[in-house]
Amino acid sequence: MKRVAVLLGGISEEREVSLASGRQVAAALRKAGYDVFEIEVGADLGAVIAALTPAPDAVFNALHGRFGEDGTIQGVLDYMGIPYTHSGVRASSMAMDKGAAKAVFAAAGLPLAQHRIVPLDELAEADPLPRPYVIKPVNEGSSVGVFILREGDNRRADIARAWRHGSVAMTEEYVPGRELTVSVLEDRALAVTEIRAEGFYDYTAKYAAGASRHEIPADVPPSVSARARDVAVAAHRALGCRGATRSDFRYDDETDRLVLLEVNTQPGMTPTSLLPEQAAHCGIDFPALCAWMVENAACRV
């Protein structure tokens, strides 16, 4: 019986999401027959290292946000020689840095929206892109700190002054249409889901039960579904990801335009999360999904 440590919590703004993910994962792994213990991660890295000594057979990394999915904890685990789920240091750090990720995607010829990384003083003075456009942190997930600026919206300077996500912001063309997402397990795209939310698909819509509706499979033409799955796998490979990822898209029906927004190297594992839903749609129940992720990690050693 493998001994598995589940890392959950963390010190990012996505701590509560990680706690929910980690608890669900731990319960599923116990159901699948693993010897599981949970490590609630806080600011004391030494305590985490101590809790991982002696080393478990594998770590299920259920952390989200900075320090949990940006290559930091991955580097610690590599140093300790402990296999872990999801992507390694390089892929995790690149995916978390939206500017670096988009450079990789552009080099791979993947479809992107127009975008610019701008200093906050420049953002306060003028629009960096034609409106409507999106303002988002360079290195946060779960739609933390995301705003849409439309014609007539006078919040730009206020947003720049109140910004607490570093000295620059990612600005990106707002693509009208539908929100699509595709989960990938190594080289297999699972399904295409359309996310329907009232208004913007923000942090609350992502994680509050009933705040958004998931249509799986998405009601899009077969050619669009195939395109989204192909791009998701290509993005996973371009970043050098391992295990599970989830790629998010916008699709404009009127122009048949599909654009890749980002790749999530630590997809949510909460009751409303998309990866478990897509896996279930493909016949993989939640304990089996979690077990696959552990075995995928363990076999890399």
Curated annotation (Swiss-Prot):
Top EC class of this enzyme: ligase
Catalysis performed (reactions): 2 D-alanine + ATP = D-alanyl-D-alanine + ADP + phosphate + H(+)
Domain ATP-grasp as annotated: residue spans: 102-295
Cofactor, free-text remark: Binds 2 magnesium or manganese ions per subunit.
One GO term (biological process): peptidoglycan biosynthetic process
EC number: 6.3.2.4
Record: residues binding ATP: 128-181
Cellular compartments annotated: Cytoplasm
Disulfide-linked positions: none
Family statement: Belongs to the D-alanine--D-alanine ligase family.
Function: Cell wall formation.
Record-given protein name: D-alanine--D-alanine ligase
Gene source species: Acidiphilium cryptum (strain JF-5)
